[in-house]
Amino acid sequence: MANYTAADIKALRERTGAGMMDVKKALDEANGDAEKAIEIIRIKGLKGATKREGRSTAEGLVAAKVNGGVGVMIEVNCETDFVAKADKFIQLADKVLNVAVESGAADLETLLATEVDGKPLSEVVVEEGAVLGEKVVVRRISRVEGTTVDAYLHKTSKDLPAQVGVLFAVDGEGEAAATAAHDIAVHVAAMAPNYLTREDVPAELVESERRIAEETAKAEGKPEAALSKIVEGRVTGFYKGEVLVDQAFAKDSKKTVAQVLEEAGVKATAVTRFRVGN
């Protein structure tokens, strides 16, 4: 007769996130000792970790937190959307985010090397992944600073945690600054600009766009005298699509993002956008 109860199985499942049969087998092997059973579950899970190393991790979530004038955002990946919405996975992401905020880490290598309960965070992630039965990866981290920082998280499906996240910082304080920062963060989530200002666009990319615009205009038979104006117009169109401050504001397309910032009396200082898997 088993020397454990249904309540013991339930409690162990809640503590480990393991399936019912795995928990029962571990309790049998441990002769009902819950702590020993947890150790068995973890060992068996870690043995399978090497088999999971080559697996694709295209699902997951984005998490972010603002503390004063500092915003931190992470992306944590797993293999399936089933695990992505699991409480244990979401709790792990929260743990990683808290470590990122408290440690001051600004890059992935530093974050993963940060000690948590006497071991590197990277080991904690592998162990938790073993319990979940999937490869789990902390893919990236962003840390931005500003007088006012907004973090916006967007769900692309009501059944999943946030798949898109934005950190947006401005040099300015007060209600107007906070409102502008939030509204523009929402805009960034939807419009996905690749650059904050024109100065951030690599010169070689601009020159490439210019050459393409010129060759396209010539192929269309545009008059030589009009080429310069046509090329500049098309390069400006490129900026309007790729550069945040040049984009039409999603909330009011009659304004540019630059105008929204000017009306609020603030200057944009940093922006980061994560989308799971991209």
Curated annotation (Swiss-Prot):
GO molecular function of the protein, one example?
translation elongation factor activity
Provide the alphabetized UniProt keywords. Answer: Cytoplasm, Elongation factor, Protein biosynthesis
GO cellular component labels: cytoplasm
Q: Where is this region: Involved in Mg(2+) ion dislocation from EF-Tu?
A: 80-83
Alphabetical list of PROSITE patterns matching this protein: EF_TS_1, EF_TS_2
Which Pfam family, any one of them, does this sequence belong to? EF_TS
The UniProt entry's coiled-coil ranges are none
Q: Which SUPFAM superfamilies match?
A: Elongation factor Ts (EF-Ts), dimerisation domain (SSF54713), UBA-like (SSF46934)
Q: What is its main location?
A: cytoplasm
Q: Where in the cell is it found?
A: Cytoplasm
Q: Which CDD domains match?
A: UBA_EF-Ts
The record ties this protein, via InterPro entries, to:
EF-Ts_dimer_sf (IPR036402), Transl_elong_EFTs/EF1B (IPR001816), Transl_elong_EFTs/EF1B_dimer (IPR014039), Transl_elong_Ts_CS (IPR018101), UBA-like_sf (IPR009060)
What the protein does comes down to: Associates with the EF-Tu.GDP complex and induces the exchange of GDP to GTP. It remains bound to the aminoacyl-tRNA.EF-Tu.GTP complex up to the GTP hydrolysis stage on the ribosome.
Question: Its family?
Answer: Belongs to the EF-Ts family.
Q: What is this protein called?
A: Elongation factor Ts
Designated gene of the protein: tsf
